[in-house]
Structures are given as structure tokens and as C-alpha cells.
Regions:
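Charged docking surfaces used in two-component/phosphorelay signaling
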Residues: 15-23
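Short hydrophobic/Thr-rich beta-strand motif most characteristic of the beta2 strand and flanking loop
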Residues: 25-32, 40
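Active-site beta3 strand of CheY-like receiver
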Residues: 44-50
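Receiver (REC) domain active-site loop signature in two-component systems and cognate sites
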Residues: 55
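C-terminal output helix
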Residues: 106-115
Length: 120
């Protein structure tokens, strides 16, 4: 069973995404910011990370860049899930190494299909 780390400073959104992934049969762990996520990834690397951009301490762009520039974690797929929906935001997220970019609000089916596709 695959493990997904959901990183969002909003507990409501974090729990909503986690619930969606749990229903899809995935194991889910959660972090409230980039620093907590980094510590969790170093301790037990997940199979995939879903992260927000705007967070305290370490934003999603910084976390994505760290994941993709660290030899032991660079193969972990990253999905940026953010309310920042401008074309530049999507471009910048992908430039940081994200494997997918989903804009909030999103359709649950889109999140599940993107996660499952990247876990193959």
C-alpha cells in the first residue's frame, strides 16, 4: 500500500484531502508546514507528496525544490495543490520540480486520478 504525505497549513483542507486519499485505499500521513514535512520525509520517505504553496516556515516551492534536489528523495512524485491558479504559478511550480499541479478548488476524481497515475 502506498503512503502519501499531505502538507497544508489548513487543517480543514489537509483533512479533506487525507480523507479522499484514504477512501481511495492509500495510507496517509500529514504535516502542517514545510519544516514538519521535511523532518517526516527524512525519517520515513513517503511514496508521494501533495503540498500547498502558501505555508509558514517553508513554503511549498521551497519544499518541492528540496525534495527534488536531495538524492535520496528526488524520485518521490510531488503534486502541488494550491489556490494560486495563474499560469505563472503553475509554471513556477513545475520549474521547482513538481510532477503535477492541481488548482483548488478541485474535483475529487482529478486528485485521485493524478495520485494514482504518479504512483504507477
Amino acid at each position: 500500500m502506498s503512503t502519501v504525505l499531505v502538507v497544508d497549513d489548513s487543517s480543514t483542507l489537509r483533512e479533506m484531502i487525507a480523507g479522499l486519499l484514504l477512501k481511495a485505499g492509500l495510507t496517509v500521513v500529514e504535516a502542517k508546514d514545510g519544516i514538519e514535512a521535511q523532518e517526516m520525509i527524512e525519517a520515513t520517505p513517503p511514496d508521494l507528496v501533495v503540498l500547498d504553496i502558501v505555508m509558514p516556515n517553508m513554503n511549498g516551492y521551497e519544499l518541492c525544490r528540496w525534495i527534488k534536489n536531495t538524492a535520496s528523495t528526488q524520485a518521490i512524485p510531488v503534486i502541488i495543490c494550491s489556490s494560486k491558479g495563474e499560469e505563472f504559478d503553475r509554471y513556477w511550480g513545475m520549474k521547482q520540480g513538481a510532477d503535477a499541479y492541481i488548482t483548488k478548488p478541485f474535483r475529487p476524481a482529478d486528485m485521485i486520478s493524478t495520485v494514482k497515475q504518479l504512483l504507477r
